[in-house]
């Protein structure tokens, strides 16, 4: 009796299933709600910018420093309240990409596909924004991790670039062999390299197949 290998499919989130950058929107929201933290963030920006230039856009600690600056000095209860407020705002303002979400649904309806949603946005935000969708409980989620530290929130893992490859390898082993991958960003090229079928999502939510 023939055995059929399961198809492993990767989806990015920001710019792929929806238009906006969830984590970037969250940081801007925090500063709008807590303008005094901008006094801390402003002198950190040159350090963050130089570090991203040297380390690359996928580096963890520069963005962790930015998150810390946006959240420093506030209790966990206050930050959780702000996060809940942001989630409500984001759900009201997010622009979904129906064509990409239709592809996701098609894979979920098949019996031979394992779906991995791998995103640079923090896991608590992703789970809170999409808690009531039929697809979130049925995908395997890998996302950036945040925790309390040094009087604010910090990133303990930033799931971007080559880190996406490393995280997926920890879950399913090596060598990676993916059937298909969907992303808007060149940052995901390291993971798309392992995909048999590669799809680029345009800023308008259209799909272009890559060679």
Curated annotation (Swiss-Prot):
| Main localization, broad class | membrane
Q: What does the record give as its pathway?
A: Phospholipid metabolism; phosphatidylglycerol biosynthesis; phosphatidylglycerol from CDP-diacylglycerol: step 2/2
This entry's Enzyme Commission designation comes to 3.1.3.27
Function statement: Lipid phosphatase which dephosphorylates phosphatidylglycerophosphate (PGP) to phosphatidylglycerol (PG).
This chain's source organism reads Escherichia coli (strain K12)
Cite the entry's keywords alphabetically: Cell inner membrane, Cell membrane, Hydrolase, Lipid degradation, Lipid metabolism, Magnesium, Membrane, Metal-binding, Phospholipid degradation, Phospholipid metabolism, Transmembrane, Transmembrane helix
What NCBIfam families is this protein classified in? YfhB_g-proteo
- List where the protein spans the membrane: 34-54
Per the UniProt topology annotation, the Periplasmic ranges are 55-211
Catalytic reactions of this protein: a 1,2-diacyl-sn-glycero-3-phospho-(1'-sn-glycero-3'-phosphate) + H2O = a 1,2-diacyl-sn-glycero-3-phospho-(1'-sn-glycerol) + phosphate
The organism's place on the tree of life at top rank: Bacteria
List the GO cellular component terms. plasma membrane
Subcellular location, in the record's words?
A: Cell inner membrane
Q: Which InterPro entries match?
A: HAD-like_sf, HAD-SF_hydro_IF_YfhB, HAD_sf
Question: Its Gene Ontology molecular function terms?
Answer: metal ion binding; phosphatidylglycerophosphatase activity
Which GO BP terms apply? Answer: glycerophospholipid biosynthetic process; phosphatidylglycerol biosynthetic process; phospholipid catabolic process
* Obligatory cofactor(s): Mg(2+)
The record's annotation in CDD domains points to: HAD_PGPPase (cd02612)
The molecule here is called Phosphatidylglycerophosphatase C
Deleted gene: phenotype:
No visible phenotype. Simultaneous deletion of pgpC and pgpA increases phosphatidylglycerophosphate (PGP) levels almost hundredfold relative to wild-type. In constrast, simultaneous deletion of pgpC and pgpB leads to a twofold increase of PGP levels. Lethal when combined with deletion of both pgpA and pgpB.
């Amino acid at each position: 009796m023939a055995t059929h290998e399961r198809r492993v499919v990767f989806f990015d989130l920001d710019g792929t299933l929806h238009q906006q950058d969830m984590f970037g929107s969250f940081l801007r929201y925090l500063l709008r709600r807590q303008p005094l933290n901008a006094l801390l963030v402003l002198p950190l920006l040159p350090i963050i910018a130089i570090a991203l230039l040297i380390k690359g856009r996928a580096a963890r600690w520069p963005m962790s420093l930015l998150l810390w600056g946006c959240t420093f000095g506030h209790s966990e209860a206050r930050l959780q309240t702000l996060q809940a407020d942001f989630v409500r705002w984001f759900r009201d303002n997010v622009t979904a990409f129906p064509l990409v979400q239709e592809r996701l649904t098609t894979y979920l309806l098949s019996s031979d596909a394992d779906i991995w949603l791998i995103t640079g946005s923090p896991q608590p935000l992703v789970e809170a924004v999409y808690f009531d969708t039929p697809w979130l409980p049925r995908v395997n989620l890998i996302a950036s991790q945040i925790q309390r530290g040094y009087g604010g929130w910090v990133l303990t893992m930033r799931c971007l670039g080559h880190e996406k490859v490393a995280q997926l390898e920890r879950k399913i082993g090596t060598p990676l062999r993916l059937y298909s991958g969907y992303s808007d960003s060149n940052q995901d090229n390291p993971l798309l390299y392992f995909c048999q079928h590669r799809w680029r999502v345009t800023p308008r939510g259209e799909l272009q197949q890559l060679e």
